[in-house]
Amino acid sequence: MRASTILYFIAIIFSSFPLLAQEEEDIPFFLIEKHPYYVQTDTITGETKEIPFKIFLDQWVIKNYRYPQEAVEKKIEGRVIVQLRIDKKGILSIKEIIGRNPLLEEEACRIFDGFPQFSPALQRGKPVNILYNYPIVFRLAN
């Protein structure tokens, strides 16, 4: 009797691990029901508007993009893929950077310094962690 009770509790404990793992799983951006968005408040009127994540992200990168001077001098060009993670609280972090040059990778990382908090992505009405791959191309003008 005692052995069967212990086995029962062990089975319950191990069966709950997949549920815990699912809660913290990062979901690809394209599978999300409601994407994250930034709430922008007009300082004069107080009106708010929702800016979709991808639009805000593009604007942020354009505004903060700088070609590293050393890369200019060495004529280094390339593409860097930044894997972004937005957690359940809407906070962005960099999960991975894939590129061929450390100077360009470092600049790609710097671009996201100070990135504001978003309203999180929702899946079935609940906040979820998501992943989004963002390419940044470093190309010198001819």
Task: State each model region's role.
Residues 1-2:
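N-terminal secretory signal peptides that target proteins for export/translocation
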Residues 5-8, 15-142:
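Charge-biased low-complexity segments
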